[in-house]
Amino acid sequence: MMSFTTSLPYPFHILLVFILSMASITLLGRILSRPTKTKDRSCQLPPGPPGWPILGNLPELFMTRPRSKYFRLAMKELKTDIACFNFAGIRAITINSDEIAREAFRERDADLADRPQLFIMETIGDNYKSMGISPYGEQFMKMKRVITTEIMSVKTLKMLEAARTIEADNLIAYVHSMYQRSETVDVRELSRVYGYAVTMRMLFGRRHVTKENVFSDDGRLGNAEKHHLEVIFNTLNCLPSFSPADYVERWLRGWNVDGQEKRVTENCNIVRSYNNPIIDERVQLWREEGGKAAVEDWLDTFITLKDQNGKYLVTPDEIKAQCVEFCIAAIDNPANNMEWTLGEMLKNPEILRKALKELDEVVGRDRLVQESDIPNLNYLKACCRETFRIHPSAHYVPSHLARQDTTLGGYFIPKGSHIHVCRPGLGRNPKIWKDPLVYKPERHLQGDGITKEVTLVETEMRFVSFSTGRRGCIGVKVGTIMMVMLLARFLQGFNWKLHQDFGPLSLEEDDASLLMAKPLHLSVEPRLAPNLYPKFRP
């Protein structure tokens, strides 16, 4: 049998020796500091693959691309819905079971509410100042309270409805202008433009990020906005990386293993270079120059909040960190959901026919669909749910960290374990879903499909949309609005068909990103009266 070290290129020998030495010291410290436990059933770890001395499963993780593939193949070989991987003494617990996922985010929610403290998280959150990636504690609770009660309140979201409607109209204007020029629509790109523009409107009150306010008259992004959007996705793609450095970070920080430290630092700095001048200018306006006549967007809301003593509640640095987090959290889900949903509808014309029938019955063709129509668009929401189930935007829910020793599925979970709930492992699990790879929106309808409203939230963890528990997404309302409005406006406004120059429809999935391996390029034709198509509004 060939040894692991002889199969590695020479430069990795040195790195391996260093990792082995540091991991040995780390593991020894963990063993010595861990209290002695009796060997009963509650102390048995979940099943896992055999590992190397000291390093555990770290070498296999290091050599596998994409990293998520290693977890998936190992669990398949082990024939288990919960597994334990040993990365130099750090336990990574992976979950494919809805029952165990519910236990994790309900019964054990308090035990598992922490986040791993990683370089990527620290960089994006500017030393953990934002909510979503901060460790469980005072800062997390403060930012969650602010966002829940103010930023995502019914009052604030209603205030921003006009801004979202502008971008829903701009979406239609953009597609219509492409039809007039006989251009092919890149569904992924267009959906990302919509998500970006809506997020910028709600966050900063404008879609442009430069003072020059340069834009085209048809809805395209300017060069600065394109670059901003690009680096937002570059930053997002750093999460999660499952880099070996995540598990032995104490010793590998600064070594730029996998290049992830350099990537996340460079891209975060560029995102901030666009965001921060807007924030600094607005902070000065509100806190030094008397402010504006009224609060108009999320940034205004953050800046003007005060505590019971009249002191400003959120610091400028906290605002900046939270704005970066909002940027990377708000755009990818609607775009990914839109591309896959439209692709599945073109593959299954009967599903498309039912969706159009619902739109024509609920909204008609004499006006554009509005946010107020969303509660009545159950079939469209069922389509969005089915896409969430079978085509998630990421392999895993953002990692949780065990704050103390606990149990899951009857197995012992040590303090400090990283908890990874697999999205495809739930949504495509034949133990949970009949014919899991068949796209069938009807499975999400109850009764006649009309009486009981469909929501995008899946509280039973049979698949993951917005997660749940203390770390669940608190932007469910606005996320639902963005997703359903994007799909509804696309379908109501246009007939879609494959473009002859791009070959047959392919729903093949990229194994690393879970995106369509081949971006969806379509031709469009208007299906409404010409006077209903709005003009672009900057």
UniProtKB/Swiss-Prot annotation:
Effect on the protein upon substituting G222V: In strain: cv. Ll-0
Tissue: Highly expressed in cotyledons, leaves, stems and siliques. Detected in flowers and lateral roots, but not in the main root. Expressed only in the vascular bundles in apical plant parts.
Disruption phenotype: Plants have a bushy phenotype with crinkled leaves and retarded vascularization.
Biological process terms in GO annotation: glucosinolate biosynthetic process; response to insect
InterPro entries: Cyt_P450, Cyt_P450_CS, Cyt_P450_E_grp-I, Cyt_P450_sf
Catalytic activities: an L-polyhomomethionine + 2 reduced [NADPH--hemoprotein reductase] + 2 O2 = an (E)-omega-(methylsulfanyl)-alkanal oxime + 2 oxidized [NADPH--hemoprotein reductase] + CO2 + 3 H2O + 2 H(+); L-dihomomethionine + 2 reduced [NADPH--hemoprotein reductase] + 2 O2 = (E)-5-(methylsulfanyl)pentanal oxime + 2 oxidized [NADPH--hemoprotein reductase] + CO2 + 3 H2O + 2 H(+); L-trihomomethionine + 2 reduced [NADPH--hemoprotein reductase] + 2 O2 = (E)-6-(methylsulfanyl)hexanal oxime + 2 oxidized [NADPH--hemoprotein reductase] + CO2 + 3 H2O + 2 H(+)
Recorded superkingdom: Eukaryota
GO molecular function, one term: heme binding
Outcome after substituting I120T: In strain: cv. Br-0 and cv. Mt-0
Entry keywords, A to Z: Endoplasmic reticulum, Heme, Iron, Membrane, Metal-binding, Monooxygenase, Oxidoreductase, Transmembrane, Transmembrane helix
Effect in UniProt of substituting C43R: In strain: cv. Ag-0, cv. Br-0, cv. C24, cv. Ct-1, cv. Edi-0, cv. Kas-1, cv. Kin-0, cv. Landsberg erecta, cv. Ll-0, cv. Lz-0, cv. Ms-0, cv. Mt-0, cv. Nd-1, cv. Nok-3, cv. Oy-0, cv. Sorbo, cv. Van-0, cv. Wa-1 and cv. Wassilewskija
Locations listed in the record: Endoplasmic reticulum membrane
Cofactor: heme
Any Gene Ontology CC annotation: endoplasmic reticulum membrane
TM region(s), chain numbering: 8-28
Result for mutant: A83G: In strain: cv. Se-0
Biological function: Catalyzes the conversion of the short chain elongated methionines di-, tri-, and tetrahomomethionine to their respective aldoximes 5-methylthiopentanaldoxime, 6-methylthiohexanaldoxime, and 7-methylheptanaldoxime.
Annotated family: Belongs to the cytochrome P450 family.
Protein name per the record: Dihomomethionine N-hydroxylase
Taxonomic lineage of the native organism: Eukaryota, Viridiplantae, Streptophyta, Embryophyta, Tracheophyta
